[in-house]
Amino acid sequence: KGIRTAPRDALVAQSSEKGKLGGSYGLHKMLDMAGSSLGALFAFLFIAFGMKYRPAFLWSVIPGVVAVMIIPLIREEKGAAPKRRRLALRGLKLDARLKWYFAVLFLFCLGNSSNAFLLLKAQSRGFSTSEVMLLYLIFSVSASILAIPAGRLSDRFGRSRILIPGYLIYGLVYLGFALLTSKVSLLILFVAYGAYTAFISGAERALIAEASPAEYKGTVLGVYGMLQGFGLLFSSIIAGGMWNVWGSDAPFWFGGVLGIVSALLIAVILRAGKGRKAADRSD
C-alpha cells in the first residue's frame, strides 16, 4: 500500500482538469469505497452461509489479481522526460503552511487508530460478528456516496470549508463511541464516520497536491502517506494500551479530543495562509 499510494495520487493530480482536483480525488475515493462495500458484503454473505475465514480470504485474492492485470493497460500522458534526481528530502522546499499542516496531521494521526478498534467497540456493545460486517458495509457505502459531492464542494468553496468540518465530524464521532451505548446510536456513528472519510479524502489530497512543487508532487504525497503510516502505527499501539489499561472508552476520548483540537489548528493554519496571500496581493 505504501508503494502504490503516492504514485497513484500523483497520477490523479496529473490527470485532473484544472479546478476539478477535489472532484477527481473524490471519484477515486468513491470507487475505492464502492469496492470496499462489495468486499464487506461478500464477506458477510460468505460467513452467513457458513464459509470459514481462510477460504473467504483466498477468494479476496481474485479481484486483486485482476486489478494488477489491468494496470499495464493504463497509458500516462506523454510529456518531457522527467529529470533524474537523487532520492533525498534535503533540497525539498515546502510552503510554511504545508509544513504546519503536516505537523497537525501527524498530531491528528496519533488519535486516528485502526478502524479495527471501531469494530471491536461495536462488538463490545453487543453486535455479532456478522452485524459488525454490516456496520463496516454501512460505513463504506456512506463514504462512497458522499466522496464525489465532498470533493466537488471543496473545488467550489475551498478546501478549508470541507476539511475543518471533516475533522470536527471525526472528533464528535469518536466522542460518540465513548459516550453512546445503544445499537441505533452506533449505527448512526458509522454513517457519520463515512461522512468524515468522504470529507477528508478528496479535499486533503487536493490541498497537498496544489501546495506541492510540480516537480516534487509525488515526493510530497509520499511524505503525506509516510506521516499517515507512522501515525497509524503509533496510534494503534497507543489505543491498544489505553484499551487494556483504562478500558474501551479511553482510546475514543483521546481520539475525539485530538480530532477537535486538530480541526481548530487547521482552521488557524489555513486562515493564516489566506491572510498572507491577501496581503501579498495588496502589496
Each model region followed by its residue ranges:
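Cytoplasmic helix-loop-helix junction between adjacent transmembrane helices
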Residues: 1-32
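Short amphipathic helix-loop junctions that connect adjacent transmembrane helices
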Residues: 116-132
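Helix-loop junctions on the cytosolic side of multi-pass membrane transporters
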Residues: 63, 71-85, 268-279
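Intracellular juxtamembrane helix-capping segments at the cytosolic ends
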Residues: 4-16, 199-212
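Helix-to-loop junctions at the C-terminal end of transmembrane segments
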Residues: 47, 146-158, 243-244
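Juxtamembrane intracellular "pre-TM" segments in multi-pass secondary transporters
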Residues: 76-104, 283
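Symmetry-related core transmembrane helices of the 12-TM Major Facilitator Superfamily/SLC fold
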Residues: 55-72, 252-268
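Structural signature of the two symmetry-related core transmembrane helices
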Residues: 61, 161-176, 256
